């Protein structure tokens, strides 16, 4: 049975600042699916086996899932390097911060996120960064520009595009990623609140 964790959801009354706390909390499938269903409206099952909620100032701002078995997530891409595979990532709906998903992507591409995976690495098996695959109606996802690199694009029979992206670990902490995001997406000008 799906269920929430003991934390409120980030809403438009809360303002993020450069001093806002950032935490990725590992959760079980019931908690992850609660937020995934809430934020993305029942997408069905997922093959992710590592699930995290993103907490900003103690409020649930997003949920993200990764493959966990090293053999499954250690995927060789066109450049011959291995990347941790993001299976899904969704954020709470926000009028104040319509680009909240960009923050989630920036955070999971940071070296601080890499630290969560480093204990699984070996001298011959190291993650170069994050990879993900998206299905969409357009040949590129604007939300990923400047964060992820488009490495392949394939038109599907159903007219959707299958897009594969990678990103190397960015040399920044969660706090530095938040500050960078706030400069471009955290201002009142970006807000849809009037």
Residue ranges of model-derived segments:
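Contiguous surface segments at macromolecular interaction interfaces
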Residues: 1, 32-33, 163, 170-194
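Acyl-donor binding region in acyl/amide transferases
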Residues: 26, 48, 56, 67-180
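Residues that form generic nucleotide/phosphate-binding pockets
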Residues: 35-39, 107, 181
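Short glycine-/small-residue motifs
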Residues: 62-63
């Amino acid at each position: 049975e799906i269920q929430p964790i003991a934390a409120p959801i980030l809403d438009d009354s809360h303002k993020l600042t450069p001093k806002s706390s950032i935490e990725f909390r590992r959760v079980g499938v019931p908690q992850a699916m609660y937020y995934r269903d809430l934020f993305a409206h029942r997408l069905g099952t997922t093959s992710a086996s590592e699930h995290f909620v993103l907490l900003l100032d103690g409020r649930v701002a997003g949920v993200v899932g990764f493959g966990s078995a090293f053999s499954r997530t250690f995927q060789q891409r066109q450049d011959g390097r291995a990347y941790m595979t993001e299976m899904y990532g969704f954020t709470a709906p926000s009028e104040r911060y319509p680009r909240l998903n960009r923050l989630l992507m920036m955070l999971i591409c940071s070296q601080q996120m890499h630290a969560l995976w480093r204990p699984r690495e070996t001298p011959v098996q190291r993650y170069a960064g994050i990879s993900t695959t998206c299905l969409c109606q357009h040949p590129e996802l604007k939300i990923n520009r400047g964060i992820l690199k488009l490495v392949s694009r394939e038109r599907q029979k159903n007219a959707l595009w299958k897009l594969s992206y990678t990103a190397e670990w960015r040399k920044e902490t969660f706090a530095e990623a938040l500050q960078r995001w706030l400069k471009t997406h955290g201002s009142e000008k970006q807000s849809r609140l009037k």
